[in-house]
Amino acid sequence: MQEPANGSRYILSEVEVMGKGGLVAQPVAPPPASKGKIILSGGNWELQRASEVTASGEEISTPGYKPENWIVATVPGTVLSSYKNIGAIADPNYADNQLQVSESFFWSNFWYRDEFEVPEGFKQDRLFLNFDGINWKANVFLNGKKLGRIEGAFMRGKFDVTDLVVPGKNVVAVEIIRNNHIGAIKEKNKQSTDFNGGILGADNPTFHATIGWDWIPTVRGRNIGIWNDVFLTSTGKVTVADPLVTSVLPLPDTTSATLTAEVIVKNHDANTVNGTLEGKVGDITFQQLVSLAAGEEKTVVFDVKDFPQLKMENPHLWWPKGYGAPNLYDANFTFKVDDKVSDAKDFKVGIRQMTFNEDNHILSLFINGRRFIGRGGNWGFGESNLNYRGREYDIAVAYHADMNFTMMRNWVGMIGDEELYEACDRHGIMIWQDFWLANPADGPDPYYPEMFIANAEDYVKRIRSHASIGLYCGRNEGFPPEQIDKALRRIIKEDHLDIHYISSSADDVVSGHGPYRMLPAKEYFTLKTGNDKFHSERGMPNVMTYESMLRTFSPEGIWPQDNEWGMHDYTREGAQGCTSFNEIIAKGYGEPQSAKEFAELAQWVNYDGHRSLFESRSQNRKGLLMWMSHSCWPSMVWQTYDYYFEPTAAYFAIKKASEPLHIQWNPATDEVEVVNYSAGTHKGLTAKVQVLNMDASVAWEKEATVDSNEDTTDKCIKLEFPENLSKVHFIKMTLTEDGKVVSDNFYHRSLEENNYQDLCQLAKVALQSATTVDKNADGTWSAVSVIENKTSTPALMIRLNVVGGKDDQQILPVFYSDNYFSLLPGEKKEVRMSWRDEDTRGNEGKVLITGYNVE
């Protein structure tokens, strides 16, 4: 081929691959039947593009049909994931591999097929085939019969297959219907991310962001497929579903709680069924007789008027992170007919009362009588190709709790995995739950409002049992169409009455609209937008570590900043405006000459910027959700840890800034502030601040006594900067209670604002350290490092990094008690770390210690 004269890339229109091939994909064995349930994930699922199939669904779903040239399918998973998992396409997350994935091939209907057997004795009165999520629509067939259709990415499918399942081999076939309005690929480059969203919004509920946004590339196929669980359930004549337990406390007293429990029951028989519905929350039990006409479905409610035992004494309340423990009770509903279990549902209950007001046109949230301050971030997806499972959600949400976050936002509602809600319940992270409407500028109103409303009704019932649900929101940065808005208000009122609904994420009683680019740290304290309201989106680029850059970029694309960087969201223009990030690094620390130097200097900016992002909200403490706290693919912007679960410096800055009781410097006023978000009352605290020259000599210091009440900010010391300070100097502050440090902070400041290049004059420091590594009884690993600076020079941006003792490769994820910290001469610090054995690759971990001026 001849290189194009204009220097552009080649366009490959056709390729033929010959040879014996390499690895052959093998299906994963499905788990055995358990408690009336057979999981059909894994197993014998196969997949084929619909254009390659001439048979009907009735034919495909028979044992005699012989699939030819079908591939092994990943279920649950998207169509694209199946092709990636068999090696048919390159990993679209790496470098610019996304350009090698065909848009036209994956814009198609696809067929899934699975053969399974039902164990003898499994079948009771009724047998159901269940789908927890497909995209976009699906026709479902079993043993030669069409069962029905599922429409919308968040609608469950449940089909009565009692009379269709046979002994021996059974076959299910699913025709996945592609989106009607796929839109165009976003062309990201070093300058621009292209425009956000597009016509795919017409098909909502779907995975709208897969059309491409400034934080995610265009996903080929738009995540069509069987993306959530498929399973068989066997029950008696009556089923139970979608439980809800609400709590009312005699506030401000929290020593008792009045519970109301409800569940939906349905009779699948052709005759009236009489039975007993039994319920249990913790040690409290209750029951009532229920009569259901043929085919009848209804909600059965238990309240304290008829069941006085539902007044719980001394409940262990569910609290968000920083307010208390997220206590959960085991709960159950069981329907019995003639003392035989027809169906049962186990779930978890958090005893908590959410209340809300919109006084003065400002939304305020309260939990168990205390004002709730939402601090956290927006999530777009768990993973861009929907590859997260329970393990990944648990890690990510645990990271959020470790950062002292209290809330996450399910932006535009595109995460539908039960495992997210379960993890938030366990870790005490409240959820701001959006519905599937992006900014009106980023896509049209849904063309199929009835489908949208049906999905919304089903989805609210599905998630309503979770204590972590804190708020529902109709639309991102806009208002839903009137038909949908009215329907959403009705649905919440009928099905989840104790949770508040707002129409818009960024207007009316809340605030939003950024900014999204990097600003000098001080400027966040002077932003007026949304200062008096809960602000739903504000962020800045957050550059990954050099180790993760090596995992993300090709050797030729890692430096200088070019189109591969743009493909991974680091663009000069657009909302992230990474030009300002580059300028702040260059002015503050000098122009980086390599990707490694850039990544290391970027951690300074990551830390200072994100600390200011949250510390600047101290005036009114109305809450902030950063844009974004979680990245769903290898991105160079808007995250706290990266796609590989590597925390950046921003993670630890946020962890500090979001402490329930916190001491901080307000650079706009030079006040030292003690901020109490959720720590209760603390009397007689001692605040101490020192201004130090670059050689660590004390230029000025002062102490003050502070009484701090919850939900307050107290100014306690006015900083002074004496003459003859070194050009770059430090501010160190501590907050102590009974001699114990409860919060500390360390800043660097310059007489020439934002220019810290004199730091490069600091001598290299040899730190003293001692580390112990232990394997715990539960199979996890723990390490403790004690680091001491015995020199006369400050040691800055000290980073601990756990790697394998044999292969020297990072172990991820790892929880660090602190990182990217500084030690003055004579200071010593203990850092605790933990990780899972399954992530070690057979290595015992060791801890590497580096830093800005550390040898």
Predicted regions and their residues:
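Aromatic, loop-rich ligand-recognition surfaces of beta-strand-rich domains
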Residues: M1-P27
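Short, solvent-exposed loop/turn segments at secondary-structure junctions
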Residues: P4-N6, E52, N135-W136, N179, ...
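Secreted/periplasmic carbohydrate-active enzymes, especially glycoside hydrolases
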Residues: Q26-M407, W411, E646, F652-E855
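Flexible loop residues that form catalytic
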Residues: P4, V15, K20, A50, ...
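Substrate-binding/catalytic cleft of secreted carbohydrate-active enzymes
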Residues: M407-E573, A602-V605, G609-L613, G623, ...
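A generic secondary-structure signal for well-formed alpha-helical elements
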Residues: G19-L23, R49, E120, I176-N180, ...
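Substrate-binding clefts and catalytic carboxylate motifs of secreted carbohydrate-active enzymes
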Residues: K37-L40, E46-A55, T74-T78, I211, ...
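Non-catalytic positions within long, well-ordered alpha-helices that form the structural scaffold/packing
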Residues: A398-A401, D425, R617-S618
